[in-house]
Design a protein with these regions (language model features):
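Acidic, Ser/Thr/Pro-rich low-complexity intrinsically disordered segments
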Residues: 218-276
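Cysteine-clustered segments with highest specificity for TGF-beta superfamily mature ligands
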Residues: 284-285
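Surface-exposed, glycine/proline- and aromatic-rich loop segments on solvent-exposed faces
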Residues: 73-78, 86-89, 93-94, 255, ...
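Surface-exposed loop/edge segments in extracytoplasmic proteins
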Residues: 56-57, 87, 208-210, 262-272
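Bacterial Sec-type N-terminal signal peptides, specifically the leucine/valine-rich hydrophobic h-region
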Residues: 15-18
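Positively charged n-region of N-terminal signal peptides that target proteins for export
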Residues: 1-7
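Acidic, serine/threonine-rich low-complexity disordered tracts
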Residues: 24-85, 94, 103-222
Length: 285
């Protein structure tokens, strides 16, 4: 009988808290160019996030710092701790974390990626890497302070996004893969300044990911991975795991055990015949 298990694990440094603080249509005509905005601590944008693997989630992106990278970058955090943890494991939202002040460039694998090349001008073209995909981007049109952009990849994937100068960030951002599935959709619901409340950004490291699949009646898989301290902040605060599991019928079962170096069980899960689970996100202190 078929038994399959896939799991991704990540050990995480911290949740940084700050207290007190549909399709896209092209547009043409309008201003010659749109300049990069200046953000302040507490500026916020309320988005609805949609992906094929999860239910829609609405959360605020909030400017938590304006002094990252020697005062050259902002830090964007989020009001949902679950979304912050998911991003740490899956790189779910590229606009969480550091963004440059010069171009609002998002960081991927430690490198700033110019998703928007300010000043934004009609027919301007540039390239960047996002979601580990290389994109060729261009400005489709400008109308007042609203700029519609698109980007294409060699595999047929495409991005469509709109920058709204009146709010200082995206009003929409959609990533569609080569098969036509929208892998990520961000739609702006509201925006403002002076956010009050906790926001989070979780820094992840020591990422471990693997997939096990077997159609035989019995299989045992053992694997080992090592977790080191963060290079500047010492021990991690927690481990976050993300898993999918699917068990065949008949007498099939799946048993998952995660042990530490002292053989203490940190996580134990069992699935019986026909059981399945998808997109589970959990934490281990």
């Amino acid at each position: 009988m078929r038994a399959a298990l896939s799991m991704a694990l990540s050990a995480l440094l911290m949740a940084t808290a700050l207290s007190g603080c549909s399709g896209i249509s092209g547009i043409v005509g309008g201003s010659d160019s749109v300049e990069v905005p200046t953000w302040e601590i507490g500026d916020w944008w309320l988005y609805t996030f949609s992906t094929p693997d999860y239910t829609d989630d609405t959360a605020r992106l909030v400017v938590a710092s304006v002094s990252e990278e020697d005062n050259t970058s902002y830090l964007l955090a989020i009001s949902s701790l679950t979304e912050a943890r998911r991003h740490a494991v899956l790189n779910h939202n590229p606009f969480l974390g550091r963004m440059t002040q010069e171009d609002l460039s998002a960081y991927e694998n430690g490198e700033a990626q110019t998703v928007m090349d300010f000043p934004l001008e009609e027919d301007k073209t540039w390239g960047f890497t996002l979601f580990s995909i290389e994109w060729s981007a261009s400005v489709w049109g400008i109308s007042g302070n609203s700029v519609t952009m698109g980007a294409n990849a060699d595999d047929g994937s495409h991005l469509e996004y709109v920058y709204d100068g009146d709010v200082g960030f995206f009003s929409a951002f959609v990533w569609t893969d080569a098969s036509g599935v929208q892998q990520m959709r961000m739609m702006l619901a509201d925006s403002g300044g002076g956010h009050s409340g906790d926001v989070y950004f979780v820094r992840g490291g020591d990422l471990y990911s693997d997939v096990w699949e077997d159609t035989g009646p019995d299989i045992e898989v053992r694997d080992t991975f090592f977790v080191s301290d963060h290079p500047s902040d010492g021990e991690w605060d927690e481990m976050i795991y993300f898993l999918d599991a699917e068990c065949g019928g008949g007498s099939s079962t799946i048993s998952l055990t995660l042990r530490d170096h002292g053989s203490l069980s940190a996580l134990e899960r069992v699935w019986g015949p026909g059981a399945s689970e998808s997109g589970t996100l959990g934490t281990i202190p």
